[in-house]
């Protein structure tokens, strides 16, 4: 049709971005796993009495599930094409589907990072009286303004929502930057 509206370049970029973000979330989940597994001097599942309570086990499960969902969402949309418009459009980029999948991967990654944030904040409490760097302590303070230290099992919905908001808004980076100066 010579409309020059073929979306393949955008579709390729969106698919590639989704793959990169999914990998980033996967690395975050692995760090979360290491915080809850009890092998680094931290209590298993980040609760003092974790044998009777599941602690941060379920949030880590949720993060692992989101990482697995992202893997399935990362099949490139741009490699799928079906003729449309009575064959006039013989190669379709599927870029709109790629954009929707990329958005879902981003949303899942934000939640995975939020779980890591919750676990990291909890783990810092077990290392006291030691202090982390100024930027980490500032970010920890921003987390603790919205999410309390856990001593027992409770539902995580409100905490996860608060942590996701902190990740999505950039508030944690902003808090750290108040101590460190601008971050890249």
Annotate the PLM regions.
Residues 1-184:
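C-terminal auxiliary extensions adjacent to catalytic cores
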